[in-house]
Amino acid sequence: LKYELGIINEMGFDTYFLIVWDLCRYAREKGIWYNARGSAAGSIVAYTLDITLVDPIEHGLIFERFLNPGRVSMPDIDLDFRDDLRSHMLEYTARKYGDDKVAQIITFGTMGARAAVRDVGRVMDIPLSEVDRAAKLIPNIPGKPMSIPEALEQVADFKQLYNSTSYFKELIDTATKMEGVTRNAGTHAAGVIITDKPTIEYIPLHRPTGSAAAEDNPIKTVTQFEMSNVDALGLLKVDFLGLSTLTIMARACDLIHERQGERYHLGNIPTDDPATYELLGRGETAGVFQVEGSGMRRYLMQMKPKTLDNVIAMVALFRPGPMEFIPSYIKRMHGDEEITYRHEMLEPVLKETYGITVYQEQIMYTAMNLAGYSASDADYLRKGVAKKKADVLLEHRQKFITGAKENNIPEDIANQIFDDWEAFARYGFPKGHAADYGVLAVQTAYLKAHFPVEYMTALLSVYQDDTDKVALYVADCRRMGIDVKPPNINASGWDFTIEDGPERAAAIRFGLGAVKNVGHGPVDAILTARADGPFSDIDDFAHRADLRQVGKRALECLIRVGALDNFGSRPALLQALDQLTSISASHFRALEIGQMSLFGKQSGVIEKITLPEISAEVGRREQLNWERELIGLYVSDHPLTPVLDLLNQTVT
């Protein structure tokens, strides 16, 4: 700790740590869940200040991976906050340090190959269909953009089009010159700079555009310099990220406290619970942070993790590149494959990962233990390996071999170890980052294993706008034996809620906010009217809820998903929709113009709603399709119910 404090002071970063500590302190005081991730997890100072939540000594993390006294660059701590309260943190930062001393960071969008063709074609007044034909011939591969010159070399049809007419040749030649040119300005999703004097004294500023220009954004300025230039100037930068997982966990823990009386937070959710690892080993990971994908689920079922270290390793390995080592890791873990080391001195470093190099920190420890590197030099080595700089690699190869020889390690073995590192460069992953995310993965699994109703309710509420995820998580609820009830005008809130049965067989009730085309305004109007008690019938609903505020479209969608089934059949309610909205509007207009009696009651006769005589069974399949369309799944029934007995006899 004394060593770290000395380095931080020598490098002039005391203020940086205190500002980040202040942000975390405020978040704790206001109940805003946060998590600091990345290489900062290697700092004991950050851990003791409650900036990071992972013990660096327990997990073998290295301070110099985060802050190297020989590499003068600004520290970088990424702060994840629950995404629904991230704006509160930005507001506090602007208020505490001054509106004129904080700014977000600009980004520049450049013109891609297709966009260049389309923009140039528009200026040249070439027919849109022709321009579109040219643009679509350039392959659009996510993560592997192809430039116009590459397309001319590799795509025969594009080359043929280029040679076909003079105007296509001019279009493509001009677009080639425009490709890569800055097209628009945006705002970095997370980066915020904080200065001691007005920001304008350090860096030119810009008015934000897009979502960053919204009135509710507490930070009103953006730098004119992008991230790399901000770093080069040495300005203090903090990344404010929003993480929905923290929102889910916080909401679930609030429900647990409300229903069970237990108070959980990130500091006391266990990571050593056997039932949690059993859940992970069964692959029941829908809604569990970082591990819910089908590939990850398959490997977890093979692994049967027993400890947090197992999960941390899987988080690091489950990426393109290292994924090829997962089968070997699992076999070694279960004793089905021999654990081997290039040299016996590697065992203390690689034992936790069964002889396989998984983390960047393992390269650093190996260089320190086998070749006498200092932690700072080991960090330079790690960086050189990661960036594949030939001159740096050659220099370090010679240095490593020389140091290894002094420890009686043969040159050929030292060369083999270094060769392994060069291959490792394809997938090296910082253990600090994997540990942060591994802890959250295990903690979310714990909440799901022990408090499934509360956890799934929070999960569904956060993802209620994503019908695909809602369908997935509702199916998982049903697998766990948790009943998910349809939206109901008298029982649902905006979010999903928990309903306890007579014997505490808790169920989850769909939130009205999960219904498509039903926004906050309509739901607020309904909930405000319902504050005096449930609606007794359709007349009571129309005369207590101002359906002008609800809106005809939202009301129609609520009827279609069955939220008003207590008041009549869906077809009948839909036919009476105009009558329903008209009577409600007349009633509330009368209230507004003061047609009230002396004692505050409406004068005259309350107009009754007459529902048409229609069988409730009419259009059953169509009603289920409405549910599928508006909330993403069948909730009141299933189209296969009539043939379920037959299916049970014939399908296994």
Regions found by a protein language model. Name each.
Residues 1-652:
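Noncatalytic, beta-rich nucleic-acid-contacting surfaces in large DNA/RNA-processing enzymes
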